[in-house]
Amino acid sequence: MNKTNDIDQLIYLFSKLPGLGIRSARRIVLYLLQDKDVRLKSLINHLIELDKKIVKCEICGNLDTKSICHICSSEYRDKSTIAIVETVAELCAMERSGNFKGLYHVLGHNLSAASRQNPRILRLPELLKRCFVENIKEVIIATNSTLEGQTTAYFIIEYLKEHPAKISRLASGIPIGGELDYLDEGTLSAAISLRQPCE
C-alpha cells in the first residue's frame, strides 16, 4: 500500500467515528500528520495508555481506570436510584446535566425491531439482581428517543415488572429520534426532573 492509500485508509477510519464525516476526518488526519512527531505521536501514546488502563465497571458497565467505577464507589451518590442508559456517552450526558445523583446501568446496546437482536445483550439479569440486592427504589429509563431506544425501553419495563421499584421515563422535551448525548444540559436536566412514571 503506498503512502496516499495509507493516508486515505486513516481518513476512512477516522470518518467512522461518531460525528465525523470524510471532510472532518481528512482535516484531523492532515493536522496530525503535518507535525507528526508532536501531534500524532502524542495521540498514539495517549491511546496506548488508555488501552492499558481503561476497563468496564463490574457493576454498571461505565468506563474507568478501576474495576468499580468512581460513580459506583462514591459514598455521595443516591444508592436507591438507577438510571438505565444505552451507552457511556449517555451516562456522560446525564452527568453533565448535574441533575442526577444516582447510579447507572449501561446497557451497551439497544434493541432493534428490525435486527431481532437477542435481549441478553442488554445485561438485564444483572440489572434485576442489582435492583433486589441493592434495594433499588426507582429505575429511570433514560434510553434515547429513537425507535430502537423506545423498543428497548418497553422491553425493560416488561422485564422489570416483577420488581417493586418505581419505574419512570425521562420527560418530554427530548425530541423524537433524539439522542441524549446531543442534548444541552438544560434540556436534559429538565427531562430528568420532570420524569414520568411508566404504567
Curated annotation (Swiss-Prot):
Q: Does the keyword Protease apply?
A: no
Q: Which InterPro entries match?
A: DNA_Rcmb_RecR (IPR000093), Rcmb_RecR (IPR023627), Rcmb_RecR_Znf (IPR015967), TOPRIM_dom (IPR006171), TOPRIM_RecR (IPR034137)
* Keyword Membrane found: no
Keywords, in A-Z order: DNA damage, DNA recombination, DNA repair, Metal-binding, Zinc, Zinc-finger
Give the GO molecular function terms: DNA binding; zinc ion binding
Among the GO biological process terms of this entry, one is: DNA repair
* A Pfam family of this chain: RecR_ZnF
> Domain Toprim, which positions?
80-175
Q: Which PROSITE patterns match?
A: RECR, TOPRIM
Q: Where are the zinc fingers (C4-type)?
A: 57-72
Q: Which NCBIfam families match?
A: recR (TIGR00615)
Q: Give the record's family classification.
A: Belongs to the RecR family.
Q: Tell me, in a sentence or two, what this protein's role is.
A: May play a role in DNA repair. It seems to be involved in an RecBC-independent recombinational process of DNA repair. It may act with RecF and RecO.
Give the protein name, as stated in the record.
Recombination protein RecR
- The primary gene name is recR
